[in-house]
Amino acid sequence: WDTGKAFDHAAPISAIVPVADVGELGARGLSLQINGQTRQDGSLADLIWDVPEILHELAKLYALRAGDLVFMGTPAGVGPLQPGDRFHAVLDGVIEHSGQIVDGPTL
């Protein structure tokens, strides 16, 4: 599931927040609005495995280092975005990130 999310022009991210500043991730909510409408709304508690379990298993396969990103899945509601769409993403109590989708290279 991790390598399927890592391809050219994929996975824009917000500012990186040090884990020491995050605290317990357990049941934090995550949400995504597109053009003012909620498209995704879920919780990290909905993951099949919790974050420490995922990192433990990945560490058996990869040399994880500070600053590495691990993509773990997403709540229901995944769909395509179009140039001009505006988004607002939230990880409760940690970060909010907003922006607009722009035209880019054809893949």
Regions found by a protein language model. Give the residues of each.
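Catalytic-core "active-site belt" of small-molecule-metabolizing enzymes
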Residues: 1-61, 65, 69, 77-107
